[in-house]
Structures are given as C-alpha cells and as structure tokens.
C-alpha cells in the first residue's frame, strides 16, 4: 500500500465543513494553515518564547464566531530579535513534520521585512509558503517585541477546525492587555484613527467577557507606561463629534459589511460601552501621572 494522502483527505473534510457552516472554502483553508503553523510553534522548543496575540487570539476565544481574520501575530520574549537568528528559528519551526495534518512548509524560501509596532517597537514580518496536496498558500507572520502583558500570559488550547488532528496548546496574551493596547491606539490616534477593528474587538471583549476592572486597569496602566501616553486635553475620542462624524459612521458600516457581520450593531452603541468602561480608567491614569 502507498503512503496515505492526508492532504487530499483534509481538503475533502474542509469542503464538508464549508457546506456545514456556510463559510467560504478559502477562508477555512487559510484558518487551517494558520492552525497548523501554530501547532508547529506549540511543539517546538520555542513554545514559551512566542505569545499569540491579535486576530488569531480572538479567534481562539470564539472560533468561527469571531471576527473573520487570517492574521498571525506574536509577541516574542526572552529571545533575540536579531532577524537572521529569528529566520533560523522559523526554519526550524516550519520544518517540524506532522503527517496527519497534510501540511508542509517551505523552509528554504523564507523572506522577511522590518515592521514597526505602534511607531515604537521594531519587529519582523516573515513570508513563507505552505503546501497541502495540490494547494499552495502564501502566509505571513508578524513578530513584535517590547510590550508588557498583564496579567502574565497563560496557555490556551487553540480550537481545531477538524477532529482527530494533533491539538494546539500555546502561550497567549491576556485579554486585558489586548484591550489595553487597542485602547492605547484609540487614544494615540484619536480623530485620525481608521482602525474600526479595534473598536469592534474592544466592544466584543467588554460585553462578552467577564473582566475584572482592577485587573483591566492594571493592564492599561502597564501598557500606557510602557508605550508612553501623553496627556491630551483636546481628546476627541469620547465626544459626540467623534462618534457622529459622517465619515467614521460610513467606515464603521463598511467594516461590518467587510467582516460579514449579520447582527445590528451601531457605532454609537459601541462607543457608549467603550466610554462607560474605559474613559474612567484613562482619567484615573492621567490623574495619577500628571
């Protein structure tokens, strides 16, 4: 008997999942390749050096019900940020063999480019190619440095698209720090902010998760101290002018359409939740730091 073609089997199972869920096949494929990349990180010797953050972390919380995203973002700690060294690390990670998932990664043609996270932190974006049966899929991963995570990172079980595939357990950001970083971006960019996903994600986390206010403030303080946040007496973020701006309202509607969000969700409602929960925290922070 010849060697089993796991890739072909997975393709069929993903087609069945598409029919069951209504999600587009290419989206499920991208999610599957991300999952199998994360599996290789999780079984590598570098498991504790890469903390999952961003859209893939939010997906880990809510599975296919989360905001559709195919981003993979890590914060690296206790590891060199030298790009040549990181390339060798990723070659090793991508070279891990897992016959059962049908995926292989091209370890010989990894490219990279420098990135800057929130104007301050140098990071690296890696580009590489994944293969499964006849499918060739281009991928990228962002690696950032220098942020603080409060409370300390915990391990999570990443949701699997298909049963009977090797499971994924890896280190991840705290949700409090996810909110803190997104809130920092809102305050920093203020009226020039077009990142609707940050407003959406903060709203979802603040309304769907039970987060302790004291712990959330600790995360906000740690992030603001680390990223530096200057007092802004002319802040527009919490004003009616900001919320009702016609361009921003249109950006919000286009964003919801882009992510195929079916429920009614106005930007005014989102901003009311963010204002009620987070405005007192930045006021407390500024009061204690002026």
Residue spans for each PLM region:
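Structured mid-to-C-terminal alpha-helical surface segments
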Residues: 1-50, 60-68, 72, 76-290
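Glycine-rich beta-strand-to-loop/alpha-helix junction loops that act as flexible
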Residues: 52-56
């Amino acid at each position: 008997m010849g060697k089993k073609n796991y890739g072909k089997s997975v393709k069929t199972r993903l087609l069945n999942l598409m029919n069951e869920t209504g999600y587009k096949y290419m989206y499920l494929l991208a999610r599957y390749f991300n999952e199998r990349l994360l599996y290789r990180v999780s079984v590598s010797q570098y498991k504790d050096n890469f903390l999952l953050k961003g859209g893939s972390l939010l997906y880990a919380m809510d599975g296919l019900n989360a905001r559709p995203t195919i981003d993979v973002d890590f914060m690296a700690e206790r590891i060199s940020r030298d790009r040549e060294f990181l390339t060798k690390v990723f070659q090793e990670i991508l070279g891990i063999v897992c016959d059962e998932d049908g995926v292989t990664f091209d370890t010989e043609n990894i490219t990279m480019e420098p990135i800057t996270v929130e104007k301050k932190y140098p990071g690296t974006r890696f580009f590489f190619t994944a293969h499964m049966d006849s499918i060739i899929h281009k991928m990228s991963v962002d690696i950032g440095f220098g942020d603080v995570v409060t409370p300390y990172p915990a391990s999570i079980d990443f949701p699997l698209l298909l049963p009977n595939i090797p499971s994924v357990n890896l280190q991840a950001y705290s949700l409090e720090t996810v909110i803190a970083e997104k809130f920092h971006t809102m305050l920093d960019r203020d009226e020039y902010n077009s990142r609707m996903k940050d407003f959406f994600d903060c709203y979802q986390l603040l309304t769907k998760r039970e987060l302790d206010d004291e712990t959330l403030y600790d995360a906000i303080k740690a992030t603001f101290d680390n990223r530096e946040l200057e007092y802004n007496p002319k802040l527009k973020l919490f004003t009616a002018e900001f919320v009702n701006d016609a361009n921003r309202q249109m950006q919000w509607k286009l964003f919801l359409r882009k992510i195929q969000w079916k429920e009614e969700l106005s930007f005014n409602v989102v901003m009311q939740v963010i204002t009620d929960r987070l405005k007192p925290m930045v006021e407390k922070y500024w009061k204690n730091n002026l």
